[in-house]
């Protein structure tokens, strides 16, 4: 047509966000099967707090924070700083790319699956 069509969101960004959203959902489903686990997704975007990890959980009395990335994804500087502050306060904080990463993190902290 005579008017160019420009996507509002670049396709690569949409695909990445979809994958990360699917990973977050899969991780939450996994966590909700664990005894003594309370987990929730934090809300990013315009109304969320920048740098806060995607998933927060209390597992058997231990605080966990998981920043979910697609495989090959990288943390922003603010996310790195936030995970470091959580660790400094005694919490467990991880960047994860799969349900298996979450299981490994919980095991590394001495938790049971």
What are these regions (language model features)?
Residues 2-113:
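Catalytic phosphate/metal-binding cores of nucleic-acid and nucleotide-processing enzymes, i.e., regions
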């Amino acid at each position: 047509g005579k008017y160019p069509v420009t996507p509002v969101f670049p396709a690569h960004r949409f695909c990445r966000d979809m994958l990360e959203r699917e990973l977050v959902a899969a991780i939450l489903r996994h966590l909700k099967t664990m005894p003594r686990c309370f987990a929730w997704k934090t809300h990013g975007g315009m109304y969320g707090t920048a740098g806060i990890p995607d998933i927060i959980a209390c597992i058997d009395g231990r605080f966990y924070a998981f920043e979910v990335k697609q495989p090959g994804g990288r943390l922003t500087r603010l996310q790195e700083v936030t995970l470091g502050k959580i660790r400094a306060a005694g919490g467990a904080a991880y960047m994860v790319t799969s349900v298996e990463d979450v299981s490994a993190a919980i095991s590394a902290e001495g938790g049971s699956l």
